[in-house]
From Swiss-Prot:
PANTHER family hit by this protein: SERINE/THREONINE-PROTEIN KINASE
Alphabetical UniProt keywords: ATP-binding, Calcium, Calmodulin-binding, Kinase, Nucleotide-binding, Serine/threonine-protein kinase, Transferase
Enzyme class: transferase
Region (Calmodulin-binding): 318-328
Name used for this protein in its record: Calcium/calmodulin-dependent serine/threonine-protein kinase
UniProt record similarity statement: Belongs to the protein kinase superfamily. CAMK Ser/Thr protein kinase family. CaMK subfamily.
Domain Protein kinase: 12-308
Binding residues for ATP: L18, G19, R20, G21, G22, F23, S24, V25, V26, K46
Catalytic reaction list: L-seryl-[protein] + ATP = O-phospho-L-seryl-[protein] + ADP + H(+); L-threonyl-[protein] + ATP = O-phospho-L-threonyl-[protein] + ADP + H(+)
Length: 415
């Protein structure tokens, strides 16, 4: 399927960057095949960065070029490790996307792959362009948000998962930012995307299992047990919980504590938020968040559930407080995603722990986001791009302001 005789630039005009990851960048592309502007096809081009060959490794960071042999050895090891992981993730995503093209596409709820190119810069996946925005971005902008809308989201994700699972594909990293609307229309289909961490039967490298977003990771994945299609159903249960409450089911002051809560399936519906909901959606969440994966419903079974179908989901507008919390959660998620992507592109293994300790599990309010933006503009020497030390300084300043605010209110804050 990989085309080595054609150049990507000959087929597509490549324009703005749509997103970045630790090992990839996504740009918008416009087909050059048609002379008519109305017939031109817009696509998303995901470039998976080619890892360096062992005989031609990337340059070591400046601090490792000194005469400190321990420092040099450690940096060399981490560099080789990063190259190895990049190679695994690149190979894995191509394998999974090929399987999707063969057995799933076209599907209204799974992103479509049009073509693949390879050159000295890496492997380029030409994908269906989803211009309707991320799942939570769309929801927080809606004038009216109800259980019916949440059920429609779950239904579309379940439809996509059912098709993937029938082909023995497990997504492994299902989360809101990996669910995008195809366009800006009201009835736009919701597409599952980003299969870099997905698995195909027994053919996936074990390294892939080391990654994933902690909020959505299943107990069996945390315990390094067998990850199956039921692991995706756990993630969907977490998404549904957030859709109906505005916050995740597992909230803790540290990742270790959060992992323990996930392993024990320790969540509740005690807060006043849940008093306005009938039993059915809560029972559905409880079934999806069973610690025993065998007790969770499959995606196909979910599509027969009365609430998911929309028969028992209520049309009443949800409390404004839920939408407000969802906005805060979404803003915090974006900040952390940008921070982690920044770390992956620099000192991936050496600095992540320090950065996570700064970010914690804080729930950013609109005024805090505005303050944080202001601090970045003051602190960043080079304008838009922050160094890690500048980022650390801004986060510390945010935490200091929050502590002052908490002391003035003289009341505990939920982290």
């Amino acid at each position: 399927m990989i085309q080595e005789t054609r150049r990507l630039a000959d087929e597509y005009e490549i324009s703005e960057i749509l997103g970045r990851g630790g090992f990839s960048v996504v740009r918008k592309g416009i087909s050059r095949k048609s002379s008519s502007s109305s017939d031109k096809t817009d696509v998303a081009i995901k470039t998976l960065k080619r890892p360096f060959a062992p005989s031609n490794p990337p340059p070591l960071p400046p601090h490792a070029r000194r005469n400190d042999q321990n420092s040099f050895a450690a940096a060399a090891f981490q560099t080789r490790k990063q190259v190895s992981i990049s190679n695994v993730l690149l190979t894995n995503e191509i394998l999974v996307m090929r399987k999707i093209v063969e057995n799933v596409s076209p599907h209204p709820n799974v992103i479509d792959l049009y073509d693949v190119y390879e050159d000295e810069n890496g492997v380029h996946l030409v994908l269906e362009l989803c211009s309707g925005g991320e799942l939570f971005d769309r929801i927080v902008k809606q004038e009216r948000y109800s259980e019916v809308g949440a059920a429609a989201v779950v239904r579309q994700i379940a439809q996509g998962l059912a098709a993937l699972h029938r082909s023995n594909i497990v997504h492994r990293d299902l989360k809101p930012e990996n669910c995008l609307f195809l366009d800006n229309t009201v009835d736009s289909p919701l597409k599952i995307m980003d299969f870099g961490l997905s698995s195909v039967e027994e053919f996936t490298d074990p390294v892939v299992g080391l990654f994933g977003s902690i909020d959505y990771v299943s107990p069996e994945a945390l315990s390094q047990g067998q990850v199956t299609s039921k692991s995706d159903m756990w993630a969907l249960g977490v998404i549904l919980y957030i859709l109906l409450s505005g916050y995740p089911p597992f909230i803790a002051q540290s990742n270790r504590q959060k992992q323990q809560m996930i392993m024990a399936g320790e969540f509740s519906f005690y807060e006043k938020t849940w008093k306005g909901f009938l039993c059915q959606p809560k029972q559905l969440i409880s079934s999806l968040l069973k610690v025993d994966p065998d007790k969770r419903p499959s995606a196909q079974e979910l599509l027969d559930h009365p609430w998911v179908v929309g028969l028992s989901a209520r049309e009443d507008q949800m409390d404004a407080e839920i939408v407000s919390r969802l906005q805060s959660f979404n803003a915090r998620r974006k900040l952390r995603a940008a921070a982690i992507a920044s770390v992956w592109t620099s000192s991936i293994f050496l600095r992540t722990k320090k950065l996570k300790s700064l970010l914690g599990s804080y729930d950013l309010k609109p005024d805090e986001i505005k303050n944080l933006s202001s601090h970045f503009k003051k602190i960043c020497v080079k304008g838009d791009n922050a160094t890690l030390s500048e980022f650390r300084l801004s986060c510390k300043r945010l935490i200091q302001l929050r502590l002052v605010s908490m002391s003035l209110r003289a009341e505990p804050a939920r982290l």
